[in-house]
């Protein structure tokens, strides 16, 4: 099954809403419409930027989409600081990232919570980008495939086969995030294939064949082509490089098969 590549730019805690507008305008200017026929491009800004991004995307009829960096497992109520999927849907979000390693590490989020957040995203019409990935000690011990498969199972617990078939999975080895270290294309393919095989067990091979599995971890315009060229890697969750409109547009164009804009 042919899967359209997805390039998702995770801005993390960077850029106020004025800077967000400037960056989206830069991406839109640098990446002509023709590329969007071959690659889906989305930005994942901080919550405070979403309304500004929505206004720009809707007003200029841009083809890029946007999403949120997290979503609450709760619909509404006395949950100070939480953001409901219903709010994100009203803002026109397409995606919600859940289970990013920084949420798992700094906010003690476990697989059960990640699965609950993924379910909440689906409930409100959002597509969850479900993140998994191993630490360096697991990689060096040679247990990375088993670790990621187990984390995948836990992070999808309770979802229906149809929901699993509609999710996006992002493999981000923790040791490669923001470090400049990048898993080789072969390393990325090894884990992403194991992810797809397990999705086949959890849902069905037919549904698994349609799931987009992304790689994340120090992705840039120099390495994205080889990574996305792997059989089971369908795009990238991009961190630092997504804050540079020119570089983000370039790597999106590369994922689309070129030529460079």
Curated annotation (Swiss-Prot):
Functional summary from the UniProt entry: Involved in the gluconeogenesis. Catalyzes stereospecifically the conversion of dihydroxyacetone phosphate (DHAP) to D-glyceraldehyde-3-phosphate (G3P).
Xref: InterPro entries: Aldolase_TIM, TIM_sf, TrioseP_Isoase_bac/euk, Triosephosphate_isomerase, Triosephosphate_isomerase_AS
Protein name, per record: Triosephosphate isomerase
Cellular component terms per the entry's GO annotation: cytosol
Organism placement in taxonomy: Bacteria, Bacillati, Actinomycetota, Actinomycetes, Mycobacteriales
PROSITE patterns: TIM_1 (PS00171), TIM_2 (PS51440)
UniProt-listed HAMAP family: TIM_B (MF_00147_B)
Active site as annotated: 100, 172
Record EC number: 5.3.1.1
Organism of provenance: Mycolicibacterium vanbaalenii (strain DSM 7251 / JCM 13017 / BCRC 16820 / KCTC 9966 / NRRL B-24157 / PYR-1)
Keyword NADP: no
This protein's pathway: Carbohydrate biosynthesis; gluconeogenesis; Carbohydrate degradation; glycolysis; D-glyceraldehyde 3-phosphate from glycerone phosphate: step 1/1
Reaction(s) catalysed by this chain's protein: D-glyceraldehyde 3-phosphate = dihydroxyacetone phosphate
Pfam families documented for this protein: TIM
A GO MF term: triose-phosphate isomerase activity
Residues annotated as transmembrane: none
Gene expressing this chain: tpiA
Single GO BP term: glyceraldehyde-3-phosphate biosynthetic process
Cell compartments where the protein resides: Cytoplasm
UniProt KW keywords: Cytoplasm, Gluconeogenesis, Glycolysis, Isomerase
Assembly mode: Homodimer.
């Amino acid at each position: 099954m042919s899967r359209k590549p997805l390039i998702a730019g995770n801005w993390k805690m960077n850029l106020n809403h004025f800077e967000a507008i400037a960056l989206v305008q830069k991406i839109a200017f640098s990446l002509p419409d023709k590329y969007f026929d071959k690659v889906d491009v989305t930005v994942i800004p901080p919550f405070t930027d979403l309304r500004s991004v929505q206004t720009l995307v809707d007003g200029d009829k841009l083809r890029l989409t946007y999403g949120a960096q997290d979503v609450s497992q709760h619909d509404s109520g006395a949950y100070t600081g939480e953001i409901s999927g219903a709010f994100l849907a009203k803002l026109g979000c397409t995606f919600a990232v859940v289970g990013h390693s920084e949420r798992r590490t700094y906010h003690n989020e476990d697989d059960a919570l990640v699965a609950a957040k993924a379910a909440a995203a689906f409930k409100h019409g959002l597509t969850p980008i479900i993140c998994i990935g191993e630490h360096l000690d697991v990689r060096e011990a040679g247990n990375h495939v088993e670790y990621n498969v187990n984390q995948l199972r836990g992070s999808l617990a309770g979802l229906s086969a149809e929901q699993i078939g509609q999710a996006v999975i992002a493999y981000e080895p923790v040791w490669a995030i923001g470090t400049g270290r990048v898993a080789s294309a072969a390393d990325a393919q090894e884990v992403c294939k194991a992810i797809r095989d397990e999705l086949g067990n959890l849902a069905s091979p037919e549904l698994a064949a349609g799931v987009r599995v992304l790689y994340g971890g120090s992705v840039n315009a120099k390495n994205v082509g080889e990574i996305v060229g792997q059989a089971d890697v369908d795009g990238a969750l991009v961190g630092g490089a997504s804050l540079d409109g020119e570089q983000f547009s370039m790597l999106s164009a590369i994922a689309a098969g070129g030529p460079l804009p």
